Amino acid sequence: MKIFSDFHHEGLYHSLHLLFEKRLGWELYRPIGLEWFKEGYWAINNQEDTARQFLEIGNEPKDDTIPLNDGHEKGDVYYIQDHHNHSWQKAITLETFKNTKFDVLLASIPQHIKPFQELIDKYQPQAKLIFQMGNHFDITGLPIKNLMASTAPFSFEGNKVFYHQEFDLGTFKPSGNPPEKMITSFINVLDKNGGMVNYYTLENIMPDYQFFSYGGQCRDGSVVGIENMARIMQNSAFGFHVKSGGDGFGHVIHNFMACGRPVIVNYSEYKNQLAGKLLIPDETCIVAEIGDDMSKVAEKIRSLTPLQYEWMCQRALDKFLEEVDYDKEERHIRKFLGDLT
């Protein structure tokens, strides 16, 4: 079975790699080449610089993020190295796509539903279209028959499955070592996020802790390699995720919890989202709404005894393992794929 997917989020795409290639034995492909953009089939936005970053072979990003198209061509396929997840992606040009038979096309943003349906109508009449929903998009009125959602469940009339995006639990796991006095953020472009003031205020009133801000355009730069990201999480006392807008899925929160580390989080943004199932105030997380008095958060952290903190870490891990079962979800996904319309 061959599946073609768009590519806009590295963590999401790697989760599709783990699902379709590693678990199901399918072949997963993504686009490469600016023809996708020029002919209207890549519609993340209308900026050519962004399109070049995602589609142009050998492109070097202008920010400090890692290149997305570093690889080589073999026959009609480009083999792209995923430096962060240490895997390889198969990418094809639009011309190769037209001459290859696919069973499924997967769109992961609403802007791609219409162009992907056009691709099916013109070149892949045998293929089925899946909409993979990783954020809380408004999909009212969109022509979606098959929904694969890594969000909190909601009402949908059609073929559907709700699941968690997979990541490597052999890497994101407890280290067995006590953490350092570190509080770490993995919020991209933190200085333009609503939680920025909370972060810098907490850092200012807690000089006994080291604060790190990782991600695109962040003070401490991007972290390359999931093993390095996991090590930083394992070494951190808390994750900082006071983020405006929240996340549909919430990779960072799930990663921290899998490592057995509690997070400082704006609970109101997440309580009704998928990651919210992991969050129990004062058990797996410390609540800090955007604009809150951060001195209260600092006091709560400082008042924890070693046993209380160790209990929070164990609760975080236990809650993750209670909510996330990739093997069980695989069975539901197989049924969903067998019922594609």
Please provide the spans of the model-predicted regions:
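N-terminal pre-catalytic "stem/leader" segment of glycosyltransferase-like enzymes
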Residues: 1-118, 123-128, 287, 326-339
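Catalytic core of nucleotide-activated saccharide and alditol-phosphate transferases
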Residues: 96-201, 324, 328
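Conserved active-site histidine-acidic residue motif and adjacent donor-binding/catalytic loop
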Residues: 215-233, 246
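Short alpha-helical segment that forms part of, or immediately flanks, the ligand-binding pocket
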Residues: 230, 253-258
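Acidic donor-binding loop of glycosyltransferase active sites
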Residues: 231-248, 261
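Short hydrophobic beta-strand element within catalytic cores of glycosyltransferases
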Residues: 262-272
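A charged, aromatic-enriched C-terminal amphipathic alpha-helix characteristic of glycosyltransferases
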Residues: 292-295, 306-341
